[in-house]
Every structure is written in structure tokens, then in C-alpha cells.
Amino acid sequence: MKRVLVKGIQGYQRFISPLKPPTCRFYPSCSHYGIEAIEKHGAVKGSYLTARRLIRCQPFHPGGLDYVPDTFDWKAPLQREKPESQRDD
């Protein structure tokens, strides 16, 4: 299952993404995040993390650095802590 999901994302990166202007608000891009999440946490958990990321990738979210977490938590909030470059301190 992991292989099918990763190949689907790679197909998007190769054939669809070049036809669109870059719009991802995050680094790494959502498609790279999806591949890493699926490879690191498996098909179900990786897909869940990818879906959460895609929900946040919209004009009303500031974006920024958002790496795949090393540990998985179903209850983790949708909004992670802001990167240091975006803190108001």
C-alpha cells in the first residue's frame, strides 16, 4: 500500500505539478512531506499526516517550516508550534 501511495504522489510531482505555479506555503512542499510521512509512518498514519498538512496549506495559514514528526500522535493539534522565525516574542 505504501508503494502505491508514494507512486501516486510521485506521479503528481512529475506530471501535474509542473503545469501549475508553485503554491505550497510550507517547506518541504506538501508532496515531499506526503512521501516522507508515508515512508516514515506507514500508509495509514502517513496519509493522515499528509491530509492534515493539505488542510493547512491554504491562504489563511502562514505556512513556514513543517517537517514530518519523528513520533506519531493521533491527538496532535492541527496547528503546530510556530517556527522561531514567526514567533512574536
Swiss-Prot record:
Subcellular locations according to the entry: Cell membrane
Cellular component GO terms, alphabetical: plasma membrane
**Pfam families the UniProt entry points to:** YidD
Q: Can you tell me where the transmembrane regions are?
A: none
Alphabetically sorted, this entry's keywords are: Cell membrane, Membrane
On whether Membrane is a keyword of this UniProt record, the answer is yes
Q: From which domain of life does this come?
A: Bacteria
**Entry keyword Cell division:** no
Q: Which family does this protein fall into?
A: Belongs to the UPF0161 family.
Name the chain's protein: Putative membrane protein insertion efficiency factor
Q: Which organism is it from?
A: Exiguobacterium sp. (strain ATCC BAA-1283 / AT1b)
Q: List the taxonomic lineage.
A: Bacteria, Bacillati, Bacillota, Bacilli, Bacillales
